[in-house]
A protein has these predicted regions:
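Hydrophobic/aromatic residues within transmembrane alpha-helices
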Residues: 16, 53, 66, 113-115
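Conserved phosphate-binding and hydrolysis motifs of nucleotide-dependent enzymes
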Residues: 19, 25, 64, 104, ...
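Acidic-histidine catalytic/liganding microenvironments
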Residues: 45, 94-95
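Glycine- (often His-adjacent) and acidic-residue-rich active-site loop
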Residues: 55-93, 134-136
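CoA-thioester-processing core
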Residues: 87-93, 101, 107-150
Length: 150
C-alpha cells in the first residue's frame, strides 16, 4: 500500500506531506486517517515542537475531499466523514505551531485545512478557492468562522 502521508522528523520539527500528487493530494478517507494518525503521533512525541504541513508536487497543497471517492459511497459526504478520523481536529489539538507550506492550490476542504494552520507560507502559484456550494458540501472544518478572522 502506498504511503499517502509522508512523515519526516528532525531537529524539533515534523514535516508532514500529503502524498497523492496525481490526484492533487485529494483527501481520501485513507489519507485523512493517515494524516490524523501522523498528527496525533507528533503530538505524543515530546521532541516535536513544530509541524510543517505541505502537499507533494507543485500543483496542489490539496484539492479537498476526494469527490470521486465520495460519489462512489452510498450516503455521500456525511457517511464518509463519520467513517474517518478528522485531521483538522488533530491539527487543532497539536500543542505547537503548525506551518502550512502551501504549494499550488488549496481548494474547498484544502482551503479549510490551510486555515487550520497557524502560519501560511505560499509560492507564486498558491491559490485559495472555496467551491463548497458548487459541489454541494457544507464547510464543516470551520471555513466560514476562520476566514472572517483573518
Amino acid at each position: 500500500m502506498k504511503e499517502l502521508v509522508l512523515v519526516e522528523k528532525a531537529g524539533g520539527y515534523g514535516m508532514v506531506t500529503l502524498n497523492r500528487p496525481k490526484a492533487m493530494n485529494a483527501l481520501s478517507a485513507e489519507l485523512r486517517n493517515q494524516l490524523a494518525s501522523a498528527i496525533d503521533d507528533m503530538q505524543a512525541d515530546e521532541d516535536i515542537r513544530v509541524i510543517i504541513l505541505t502537499g507533494a508536487g507543485d500543483k496542489a497543497f490539496t484539492a479537498g475531499l476526494d469527490l470521486k471517492e465520495m460519489g462512489a459511497q452510498q450516503g455521500g459526504g456525511p457517511a464518509l466523514a463519520i467513517a474517518s478520523d478528522d485531521p483538522v481536529v488533530a491539527l487543532g489539538k497539536f500543542s505547537g505551531p503548525i506551518i502550512g507550506a502551501i504549494n499550488g492550490v488549496a481548494i474547498t476542504g484544502g482551503f479549510e485545512m490551510a486555515l487550520a494552520c497557524d502560519v501560511l507560507i505560499g509560492t507564486p502559484n498558491t491559490r485559495f478557492a472555496d467551491t463548497h456550494a458548487r459541489v454541494g458540501i457544507l464547510p464543516g472544518w470551520g471555513l466560514s468562522q476562520k476566514l472572517m478572522r483573518l
